[in-house]
Amino acid sequence: MEDLKSIIRNIPDFPKKGILFKDITTLLGDAKSFQRMVDLLSHRYVGQKIDKVVGVEARGFIIGAALAYKLGAGIVLVRKPGKLPSKTRSKTYDLEYGTDTLEIHTDAFNKGDRVLIADDLLATGGTMAAVVDLISSMDVELVECCFMAELEFLEGGKKLPEGKVFSLLKF
């Protein structure tokens, strides 16, 4: 895994001073590394009968679509308000300074679907906790929340269901 971790570029003071940003675009842009990352993540879920993979806006779409393809599952998009064309349900959640809202189509799942939620990076866990809450009343089974990378020192996994978090790369 160290080889994949080393491809991710560090950008100091982005998006604000004091933050060391993990820029995953370097890994995504390297074909062999991207393929390896998708293969390693998808291997964990082979045989688990995943019906739908939820991709969280925006980089979660990349990870989610690749996993859905590899697993023979459908892809469901969770987006910012006003971006989905049909009837939606929404979840507003707290940020460090203010709030944000996510939406999902009300007809995104079939009853009993086994769902994998995918995103690029687990940091504070606020966004993923909102996604878990958003789908929790939609009569589906949450298999796991998976991430390409996790910033462990931020302890975002503590906001998510115990035993339902997997991160391929940990920083």
Curated annotation (Swiss-Prot):
Keywords annotated in UniProt: Cytoplasm, Glycosyltransferase, Purine salvage, Transferase
Record EC number: 2.4.2.7
Keyword Glycosyltransferase found: yes
Subunit structure: Homodimer.
Organism of provenance: Citrifermentans bemidjiense (strain ATCC BAA-1014 / DSM 16622 / JCM 12645 / Bem) (Geobacter bemidjiensis)
Function (record text): Catalyzes a salvage reaction resulting in the formation of AMP, that is energically less costly than de novo synthesis.
Gene Ontology CC entries for this record: cytoplasm
Protein name: Adenine phosphoribosyltransferase
Entry's Gene Ontology BP terms: adenine salvage; AMP salvage; purine ribonucleoside salvage
